Amino acid sequence: MSGQPMAGRDGARLESFLEMMSAERGAAANTLSSYEHDLADLREFLGRRGQSLTEAQTPDLSAYLTHLAAQGFAATSQARRLSSMRQFYRFLYSEGLRGDDPTGIIDAPRKGLALPKTMSVADVNRLLGLAAQEAATEGPGQLARIRMHLLLELLYATGMRVSELVSLPVKVLRQEGRFLMIRGKGNKDRMVLLSRAAIEAMEKYEAGRKALSQEKSKAAASQKKTDTAESPWLFPSNSKEGHLPRQVFARDLKDIAIRAGLTASAVSPHVLRHAFASHLLQNGADLRAVQELLGHSDISTTQIYTHVLEERLQELVQTHHPLAKQGKNLD
């Protein structure tokens, strides 16, 4: 760690951020002033928690937004503060000044207790379609594009938590059939079903990994290196955990959402998990079955999705209930 005092380092990086926004982004003076004010307020809040602006983690930033809400800030004002935070931490990440973006999985504040965000089937298809198209594009970075396509197919096909998704072991590539065993909260195992599209994406990703591994082995052999051990993770990374950080995936998901013409704030790993559950229920799935697939230990947790059933249940009652039929006969 640098010998520079924490307060001094925070100030220097904040100054560098503002200089970048001015020189490279052409931000107006009022915009720069807003960034400076927002981040100075965040810095003061973090200081009271014994945390620095540079090293703040997701829970620290979420606590700040909660603090703003408790102070009576409108959702729009909270969203502006979050936007300033996103710009700053993306700058730190892009400059290599920290290894992650702690704002990647923070959703924009919203008023009141809202129903779970979800996506329409059309929007999900749009997202998956673009991911497949980009994965098929040859050239530099193709394996990363294939990986992104697989991540999205797995997430929508299974409804996995993002923490479960990014930490899948590489041994899942050796599993046969359409079922996948995953380990969720409390180290509880559960079985999920893979779609045909997810299986095909996994096969393409496996082929890409093998090709890269062979290239690395050849390079190591030419340099007489022997350390070519394979990562135990399906989505390896140079992160502390060794696998793809969920914040990085969340950020990349918002980027591809924008390219697909969707609103970035309306798309996140958790929203895709909600879409998985909502679309199953809309098409007649049993709530208990969805509970098992999501890995909820309590049915009450799954019941937040019952709002999607209202229209379908009304139609079922009108079509199949004996009294409803009797009423039709009397007409």
Curated annotation (Swiss-Prot):
Family: Belongs to the 'phage' integrase family. XerD subfamily.
Pfam families on file: Phage_int_SAM_1 (PF02899), Phage_integrase (PF00589)
Domain Tyr recombinase: 114-318
Keywords: Cell cycle, Cell division, Chromosome partition, Cytoplasm, DNA integration, DNA recombination, DNA-binding
Annotated signal peptide: none
PROSITE patterns to which the protein is assigned, alphabetical: CB, TYR_RECOMBINASE
Origin species: Agrobacterium fabrum (strain C58 / ATCC 33970) (Agrobacterium tumefaciens (strain C58))
InterPro entries: CB (IPR044068), DNA_brk_join_enz (IPR011010), Integrase-like_cat_sf (IPR013762), Integrase_catalytic (IPR002104), Integrase_recombinase_N (IPR010998), Integrase_SAM-like_N (IPR004107), Recomb_XerD (IPR011932), Tyrosine_recombinase_XerC/XerD (IPR023009)
Region of interest (Disordered), ranges: 214-239
Compositionally biased residues, Basic and acidic residues: 214-228
Any one annotated GO CC term: cytoplasm
Gene behind this protein: xerD
Keyword Cytoplasm annotated: yes
Main location: cytoplasm
Protein name: Tyrosine recombinase XerD
Subcellular location: Cytoplasm
Active site per the UniProt annotation: R161, K185, H270, R273, H296, Y305 (o-(3'-phospho-dna)-tyrosine intermediate)
Subunit structure, interactors included: Forms a cyclic heterotetrameric complex composed of two molecules of XerC and two molecules of XerD.
GO function term, MF aspect, one: tyrosine-based site-specific recombinase activity
PANTHER family (alphabetical): PHAGE INTEGRASE-RELATED, TYROSINE RECOMBINASE XERD
